[in-house]
Amino acid sequence: MIRSRFVRSLTLVLATFVALSCSDATATGPLAPSAAQDGLLSGLVGTVTGLLGTVLKVIGFQTDPNGIDVYAVRWAPTHVNAVRTVSATIGVNGGSLSIPGSDFTITFPSGALSGPTTISITSDASGYVSYDMQPHGLVFKKPVIVTQRLKNTSVYGTPIALNAFGAYFATDPLDLSGLLKALEIETTTIFSGSSGLPEVETWSLNHFSRYMLASG
């Protein structure tokens, strides 16, 4: 199961890289549905190129209705805390959105959505690597892929980077410090950069709403 999820994720990442190499468009606001297939890609070529490095680790999907103990990961001092939002309409042909200031991109494969859907992603100013993804409760027909760079996070260059993953919360935790209870740990693939350190990771998502970078 883990291998199958990884193959699907890697295939989509490689497809995203090919598309990015053909486009330098950035989604900074709502676009028409017809632009979703080839007009929403953000230009984070370096992010996806980094994914072509060595796979260091794959963290398998986990879920527990009673909650899984995790710790939210903070941004590093190099990151400027601010509320950043990107929104666009994505159709059945797929597309991508990015928040460059948060080193974040999300890619929807063709067929993930049943029809044109307005997608909105917000990176908050909490000081943690956390995102609100709307519409809340949206379920995908195919997994979508989040790409998160690690360089501006507090785990970069530490052993914790090899145990950092995407975590799902049904509601927005009021306090992100200390021990948290995640409902899911998403399938996470961690890649190295030229330095050999964990540089970037992908999360495979089956639904929205509240996700963050966390560690066990």
Where are the regions a protein language model picked out?
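Short beta-strand elements of extracellular/lumenal beta-sandwich folds
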Residues: 127-133
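Proteolytic cleavage junctions
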Residues: 23-105, 113-119, 124, 136-139, ...
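Bacterial N-terminal signal peptides that target proteins for export
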Residues: 2-11
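C-terminal motif of bacterial Sec signal peptides marking the signal peptidase cleavage site
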Residues: 18-21
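B-type heme-binding environments
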Residues: 108
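Contiguous beta-strand segments within globular domains
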Residues: 137-148
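Beta-strand secondary-structure signal
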Residues: 105, 130, 145-147, 202
